[in-house]
Amino acid sequence: MKEILCVDIGGSKYMVGVITPEGKILYSRKVLWKGEAGNPGRILGNIIQTVDEVLEKHPLCRKNPMGMTIPGLADPEKGVWRSSEFLGVFNLPVGSLFQRRYGVPLKMENDANACAYAECFFGEGRMCKDFLYLTVSNSIGGALCLNGEIYTGAWGEAGEFGMCPAEDLLEK
């Protein structure tokens, strides 16, 4: 069975999991952030430590490309985490760092875009060519699906509402 390691980074936590190509979850581990915001080295170090621990339990993942979703702006072609305002991450070359450490490619995408991709292929998005996907958590994000494809625009930011903090809005 093919196993794929995935990392989902959020504003309050990150998750490292192992899935099959069909989307079956074989393993999942959630880790809460503990004051790492503003320290990209510590953020990445904690993620790498968890990935290493998961790879010990699931060594078959070492043979396959890995996936990562990030809050904020991504450059999927270059594997760069361009920005995440509330985590204080800017221009972090995660793709090349993972490639060097693990010897396999890392496919990175903005979290809302990744969710919209999932809707296009597995969810309600299969029934329509055009839709707007919204995510509301620690921040508000979005993705546009036009003609059955995720539209990112000239700078890769189309559909992204920016890092709009939602926590303050919920308290009022």
Model-derived features: positions:
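Residue-level recognition of short loop/turn positions
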Residues: 1, 22, 77-78, 147
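Glycine/GP-enriched mid-protein hinge/lid loop-to-helix segment characteristic of carbohydrate kinases
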Residues: 3-5, 17-19, 28-30, 37-40, ...
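Hydrophobic "anchor" residues
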Residues: 24-25, 81, 150-151
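N-terminal phosphate-binding loop and adjacent alpha-helix
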Residues: 25-62
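Glycine-rich phosphate-binding loop and adjoining helix at the ATP-binding site
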Residues: 40-48, 52, 64-66, 72-130
